Amino acid sequence: MALWLLLVVSLLVLGGCATRPINPPIAEVHPERGYRLESRQAHVKDKSNLVVLAFSGGGTRAAAFSYGVLEFLRRTRIVGATGKEARLLDQVDVISGVSGGSFTALAYGLYGDKLFSEYESRFLKRDVQGEITARFFSPRYWPNLWSSNWGRSELAADLYDEILFNGATFGDLDRSNGPLIMASATDISTGARLVFDQDFFDLLCSDLDEVPLSRAAAASSAVPVVLSAVTLNNYGGSCNYAAPRWLQLLTGPTGPPRPAA
């Protein structure tokens, strides 16, 4: 009995040390910097056309389907804007992904063509759900799971990082030459769409470059009840944020106010 009590106390103490990654604050918004479309104009292949792919969710099946789309585009040849033959895949400027589709999008943004030699073995053909379940029932992870600062989605994010993303962050994507990747999740408090790009993180007064890709994938695929919500720190109001001009025009009044009757 004393041994079991000692074990429980030890697990609780260790669990109190576990914490989630913290998205860091920024002191000032710089619209020309960070991982956003406006700062990646040099990566747009054809200035007359913006080519966007949208990958939907649906678990591993969605990840496999979106991977098949990329493979097809890689094999398809077209005549590019310069008059030379090119791969259709190389004309893609933006990839939006949610849930299972976000894994493929983020991995392609990180690895480029290397994806086609590794993605199947490292992710698609693994029993990822089984591995998450095994970790959940492993005593090794119980201390972390008992911590109020670390949930089931953090457990999943750690696995995604180990098997696919290798510690990469959005800063690594920002330094790549690939298309802009926009992983989406849902704000559980409002039901609104949350996009992992610096435009949205400016609202939080936070630096997206330091956020691991694995956390974006975990947030995008966090099925309610099965997985916990991924928490982001909100430092809003501390970085002199001002809405961009296009947003002001969209949300502002369309004409002068009318006098009350």
Question: How should each PLM-predicted stretch be described?
Answer:
Residues 4-15:
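Bacterial N-terminal signal peptides
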Residues 15-261:
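Catalytic domains of lipid- and phosphate-ester/thioester hydrolases
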